């Protein structure tokens, strides 16, 4: 299976997004007795028209991790879609807020409150303008660099959460940024996109263990081997 075909399979396998507002925290009985150690959040906008935009690569990463590690099907909860699973023995809740990017933090806060987790238990996967396309870096805390999803998350939970920065590059002109981040990945970029998502999913156990340096190193090695 080629990387391009793998990416298509990933998107074809995603659970259908049910129209209407997803369930909020009080309706989170969908989670059953699951008690995650960590909450991993993919940032993006809900709906098919946004699915392949650069701004949605956080959603893509969450889907890739869930599919690669055999997470349970998505359930409506916390104003988003949540999937339960384990990575390297660590219980993880993968969350895709369905609140649209500008209000992502509300969904994250709801999940944190429900499971009584701290900001240090949260990892956010997001698109990063200030990183070359398909490069991956991890940092703890920091600013928002104008990213509305990060800004909303910070407003609701503070800024000391871990970020997995998924490089999309910069168009070179600040006036072109909005059109660029809301633009779809080109067909010619699909193999590189699939390679990045596959590497992030394959090395996710290092994130679960808190070894960010090893995660970044092994992802970089995988991507170098794919060049």
Per-region residue spans from a language model:
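Hydrophobic alpha-helical segments within soluble ligand-binding/sensing domains
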Residues: 145-149
